[in-house]
């Protein structure tokens, strides 16, 4: 019988209230994250997802004062009783604004910052820095200044900077916030590649769900009003109405399927457009729906774009 792994992150009846607020931002959180998992934590603005992340990496309560109840264990340590410095040895965080993490004058200096603080010998420091840069594909930019880099390249530098500590947990706080869709896909590909190479536990805090699902995740944890509403596989979550009901835009191909009258179930494997299982009846419904839509070059602002929906027709193998 295979022994079940112990969670690397464990919330037990955990609540957190910022000192400046009258009521808790997080209430009754129970959640286990296991070693090697890649988990998306999704929720609308103000849902509590960033507060959840801040409790994991130590920003709460050490940079943002507040009180907690319950228990939060991160890689074997009590997060609420540990210093932010101690937690940084377990959790590496890449912020949505990588400019806020730059410290060195060059890419190489920035990646090596934590090594300098720990008095790593020069030869070892160069070796580790080079390896981290190669791992994220930024090795040819070590002499560049931060302002010479694109948004995606800055994110790679931030990632390399936290990986030199060989942390077990990587936390990405809205990594797509400042990236266009193409750069966003590259970022998700990089995160997926790093996770596979290192077997690191990865948490992605993000509301751009379709972009994150460009690569597989093990689970999606849906947060709203400071509580966990769902902890499901992508296939199971996308077969519900929970995303729409909580202000998260579901993937556009899912919207197209719903408009066409298709019953979306987990058995149809809806997590990725190119792997959706559609029988002949479903395919006919989609073709008929696409054919019946008049093309309108002027679509209402904020509406689901028919043009974008149409772009998924090929992905759905129609």
Model regions: which residues?
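Conserved ABC ATPase "signature" region
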Residues: 123-141
């Amino acid at each position: 019988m295979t022994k079940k792994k112990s969670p690397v992150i464990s919330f037990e009846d955990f609540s957190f209230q910022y000192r400046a607020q009258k009521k808790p931002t997080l209430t009754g959180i129970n959640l286990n994250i296991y070693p090697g998992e890649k988990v998306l934590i999704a929720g609308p603005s103000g849902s509590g997802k960033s507060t959840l992340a801040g409790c994991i990496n130590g920003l709460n309560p050490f940079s943002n004062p507040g009180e907690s109840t319950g228990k939060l264990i991160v890689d074997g340590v009590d997060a609420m009783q540990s210093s932010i410095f101690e937690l940084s040895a377990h959790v590496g965080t890449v912020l949505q604004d990588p400019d806020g993490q730059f410290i060195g004058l060059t890419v190489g200096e920035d990646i090596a910052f934590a090594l300098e603080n720990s008095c790593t010998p020069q030869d070892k420091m160069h070796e580790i820095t080079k390896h981290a840069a190669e791992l994220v594909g930024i090795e040819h930019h070590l002499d560049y200044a931060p302002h010479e880099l694109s948004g995606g390249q800055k994110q790679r530098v931030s990632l390399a900077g936290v990986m030199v500590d060989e942390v077990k947990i990587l936390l990405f706080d809205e990594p797509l916030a400042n990236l266009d869709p193409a750069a966003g896909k590259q970022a998700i590909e990089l995160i997926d590649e790093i996770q596979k190479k290192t077997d690191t536990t990865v948490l992605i805090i993000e509301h751009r769900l379709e972009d994150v699902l460009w690569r597989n995740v093990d689970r999606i944890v849906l947060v709203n009003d400071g509580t966990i509403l769902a902890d499901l596989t992508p296939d199971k979550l996308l077969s519900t109405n929970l995303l729409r009901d909580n202000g998260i835009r579901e993937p556009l191909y899912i919207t197209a399927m719903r408009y066409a009258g298709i019953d979306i179930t987990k058995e149809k494997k809806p997590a990725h457009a190119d792997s959706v299982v559609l029988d002949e009846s479903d395919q006919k419904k989609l073709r008929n729906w696409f054919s019946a839509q008049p093309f309108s070059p002027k679509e209402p602002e904020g509406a689901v774009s028919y043009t974008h929906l149409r772009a998924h027709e090929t992905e759905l193998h129609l």
